[in-house]
Amino acid sequence: MQRAVVELGATADALEAADVRLLYVGSFGGMEQGLVARESNLPFQAITAAAVRGRNPFQLVKNSVLIARGIREARALIRRERPAAILGTGGYVCFPLFVAARQLRVPTMIYLPDIVPGLAVKVLARIATQVACSFEPSLSYLPRGKTIVTGYPVRSELFTVDRVASRATFGLTDEAPVLFVYGGSRGARRINRAIETLLPDVLRIAQIIHVCGREGDETWLRAAADRLPVELQARYHLFPYLHGTMTQAFGAADLVVARAGASTLAELPAAKLPAVLVPLAGVHQDENADYLVAHGAAIKVADHAMLGSDEPTDGPLFQEVRRLLIDTRMREEMAQRSAALAKPDADGRIADALLDLAARSGAPV
């Protein structure tokens, strides 16, 4: 959900520049409201939402009742707010909202951040007025007649972040390259465990910024760091979460180890960074990672095989990280290939498409 708030926040800036009034619609009891307040300051309204599917017949009936209620609430909300157009990213709240919008003839756009759409986006793409996607390979999964490629909107500061100032933010030096490890706002425990195991070996050749997430991993990672020699401890910069300085972490880095979420596919090119990606299984991250790998901007390591069976350092995670940290020329070539994939005008493309959609519908913008 944070990803949706941030990506729509970038688009919101472009829409607000066009003097458009914005409203974020989320679900009751969800985490959206707090994130919206913190990340974008957009006004927020909630409606009832539930999964289109259910784990069993009882759950399916219950969800159907909740969705019907959500559609009624969405109709009332649309009549009250009179939106010129609606943009969604595929969460549960989008289905009742898009159904109500279609009934009331309000144009809608569904936006696909990842390469491969999930069930929700596939369903919504059929009823949406227009579909937008981040990357060209997604076109094979979506209705071509109404799908456009916009890129993925990211913070504009990523394109111009200053390396020297960014390193100063974290107290980093130029004596060794900087590895940035992160697994999203909630972290990635398997990556964190692998980094814990490899910590002394990596710190001998690099400085590390490690954003471990808010799931309690900081405690045992901090304990592992405290057992290191003092000179290696000074090279390790551990945070559960970065609020306000994530851009500087990208700016300070020479190499990234991360999952392969949609935001990563856009942030790495924006920051001109190569990466070793460890896709999370079962959520289409493999296809996301393959996109950067195919363009020579990243290397993919399987989540289940990061470490060696005998010696952890014999595994592909350490071997690939070590190779890229040591081989400056290869790292810089990958960085250039990564930068070539950037779409700095993605937020403007989505905003323009949404405004055009509203104008063609005859609705007042």
Range-by-range predicted roles:
Residues 323, 330-344:
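A short, well-ordered alpha-helix in the C-terminal region of glycosyltransferases
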Residues 12-71, 301-305:
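Conserved nucleotide-sugar phosphate-binding/catalytic loop shared by glycosyltransferases and other
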Residues 30-34, 86-104:
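An aromatic- and histidine-rich active-site surface loop
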Residues 87-89, 246-286:
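A donor-sugar binding/catalytic signature common to diverse glycosyltransferases
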